[in-house]
Amino acid sequence: HIAHNCVIGKNSMILVPTSVSGSAEIGEDCHIAADIIRNQVKIGDRAMLGLGSVVVKDIPENVIAYGNPARPVRKRFEEA
């Protein structure tokens, strides 16, 4: 389920069953696996969310996050 006023960036992959609440923003090149994303949450570019995560706060760009509530655990790509 994807609610009203959501913004989803290009090349993002959302696997089912994922629930995205109203006014959530998903950045570019994100990978989201069967998660719950609460309303008015922003997920940064290139973020990856682990299976079954519940996102209640903003997730920065370029991180891998998972859990309930979802927390960043490490950078997705090392900076050059």
Regions found by a protein language model. Give the residues of each.
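Structural signal for interior beta-strand "rungs" in well-ordered beta-sheet cores
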Residues: 1-66, 70-73
